[in-house]
């Protein structure tokens, strides 16, 4: 898939994330890259056949102090190749992108892996409604 088409799917997936999460995002950009680098996979101790779909780079909201500011935006990296290879069709790809975005946005908010897993379970796998998920 070409990059503009993939970026449109990213926009579609982002639009499907509960509004309260989207509205709480500030000074963060979503960047699409082809693949995670071998160095990054090594640093994160990820070995084939496992791979990385996304990565949050920045300072979680819970770690910011009163003087935090004048910084470059935090970044959520999405890796197009692994996401595409893991999805059979565009609808599956939008879901995979959405799950990855939710996970990385959770890191932005300073959530633990357990908290992120609960949100993923309730929203993506369990069908909880938006108000239930975002409180």
Residue ranges and their predicted role:
Residues 1-95, 108-135:
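Metalloprotease/metallohydrolase-associated module, dominated by Zn2+-dependent proteases
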Residues 99-108:
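Active-site recognition of the HExxH zinc-binding catalytic motif
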């Amino acid at each position: 898939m070409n990059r503009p088409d993939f970026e449109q799917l990213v926009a579609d997936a982002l639009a499907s994330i509960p509004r309260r999460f989207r509205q709480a995002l500030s000074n963060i950009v979503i960047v699409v890259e082809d693949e995670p680098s071998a160095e990054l996979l090594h640093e994160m101790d990820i070995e084939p056949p496992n791979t990385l779909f996304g990565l949050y780079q920045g300072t979680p909201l819970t770690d910011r102090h009163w003087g935090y500011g004048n910084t470059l935006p935090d970044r959520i990296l999405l890796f197009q190749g692994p996401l595409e290879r893991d999805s059979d069709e565009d609808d599956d790809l939008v879901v995979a992108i959405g799950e990855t975005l939710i996970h990385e946005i959770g890191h932005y908010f300073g959530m633990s892996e357990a908290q992120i897993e609960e949100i993923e379970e309730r929203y993506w796998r369990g069908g909880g409604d938006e108000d239930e998920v975002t409180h």
